[in-house]
Amino acid sequence: MSHYHNYIVAAMDMLIGDPDVIDPDEIKPDTKKKADFLCIPIQYLDKLGEWRHELSSRGEASKRLINSMGGMLSYLNNHPNSENAFTLANGMKVVFREVPHSIEAHSTQLAISLGQELKNKLASKKGSVAIMTGSDWMVAKASAAHIDVARINPDIYTGRTKVNLPLDAAQLWTKDHHISEAEWKDIFPGKNIHFNEFVEFEIKNFGQAQGGYSNIGRFTYDNHGNPAVIPLKYVKFASPSYRNIRPITNVQAMYFEALLAPVDEIPIVVFSGIFGTGKTFLAVAAGLNGVGYHTTKPDVPYDRIFICPRDSALGKDVGFLPGSLPDKTMPMAMPIIDNIYDVMKIIRDTAGTAKYPADEEKSKDDSGYNSSKKRNRKHAKPQNNDNAMVKKTSSGTISKEVLDITNEYFEFQPLIYMGGRSISNALIYYDEFQDVERFQARELVSRIGNGSKIVITGDPSQLSNPHLNRTSNGLNYIGTKLADKPYAAIIGCTDEDEIVRHWVLREVAKALK
């Protein structure tokens, strides 16, 4: 193999992290020289064959990689000593090399040993060797062995961009409130913009003088059906009861715009945000407004709010827990219940009264409403007494009022019971999606039915699934795959200054960086 000049050695995390990265145009070591061959320690095949039976992203990735190899594995079985190169479907040439059997197949040392061997062979020749990995640990080991690294660190799509709008173009926005796609290309040549991407304009001598979030736009279709950056349209609740629930930061304004947009305009919302940015709170508020809680709207978009509890994202079975399914899921539902209470409290403060009279249209002997009545109902207003009418549950003491609202509007379903479901006319909320495997993410998104909106949130910095990382998790997977799709809004937030839950959290986030 002395005539081969430039090599990329595959670390195992590169193979199972996402086989899509095996692309000639993407595989470039730090030396900026394009690789001629991708070298894989042959012992990795044993692990790929073992892992392909797993119900996990690792198993799925192993199957995809094996399938992409076509007849390569069959040929290797018949020619175990062959050093011929094989070509994958995407054109990348691959060679398998034996590494001493004393090294275990799953060891990170396999790639290091193969890299050192190839580097020694090239000592007197022109060429390069680099180890391809996304692991910080592998980068450190390669550096210690004086081997270059081809780092897998794909950019994470945030769905937002900040630009300085030239003064001569400022009137297009501040006066016309409209920048067409052609005008965008003229103002910002070479800067691409995706559908449903949010734009924060910085305009010298203008600022935010017009108030609100007038400096934020969204790239979508205008009233004439033409692609353009237009102002936010849905960022405020129409119901007076919800008028004090409003965005505090720019990223919340973007998230809220997507939440309140009609289902036929944005049926999928993905918000990847640092803790304390209002991911769950705003989703709960939008959901309660959407089912008609404390509003007088004659028609509402949703019949229910569907929640996949956070602990079930890790695939935890709840079957062993005592009680009915609602009893089993109640401990997982507490983050939602906390936010229901917070939303109710703001609604009370908005009304400015200690106690609301019951709606005249709701008779005293009416114990509730069934699902067929949900679209044309009025609801009793909450009593402004946080300690009144409480009920003790296995998860603690919950206000009966909050519990009644939870039972009336919310449905909790663990991940393991989601297969085959079709959820219509609902706001479907998936939290902690950073702990969801990619194959699970596809299954969950496919549960959407007519009239439903899916809201997916999570924080990649708080991974609990040991098999995932910040790029291979379900949250980033869905956000990346749906970027630039007109039916999806993808929003990312990593700025500590956009934390709103408590001022001290901003300082904590900065200290823990």
What positions do the PLM features span?
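Conserved helicase motor core of SF1/SF2 NTP-dependent helicases
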Residues: M14-G70, D136-W137, K141-A145, A150, ...
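Active-site-proximal, substrate-binding regions of enzyme catalytic domains
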Residues: H3-A130, D136-Y242
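Hydrophobic residues in beta-strands of the RecA-like P-loop NTPase core, especially within AAA+ ATPase
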Residues: A10, Y429-Y430
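Polar low-complexity intrinsically disordered regions
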Residues: M1-H5, P24-A35, N120-S128, D148, ...
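Small/flexible residues
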Residues: T220, F306, R377-H379
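Intrinsically disordered, low-complexity sequence elements enriched in Ser/Thr/Gly/Pro
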Residues: S56, I216, S371-R375, I499
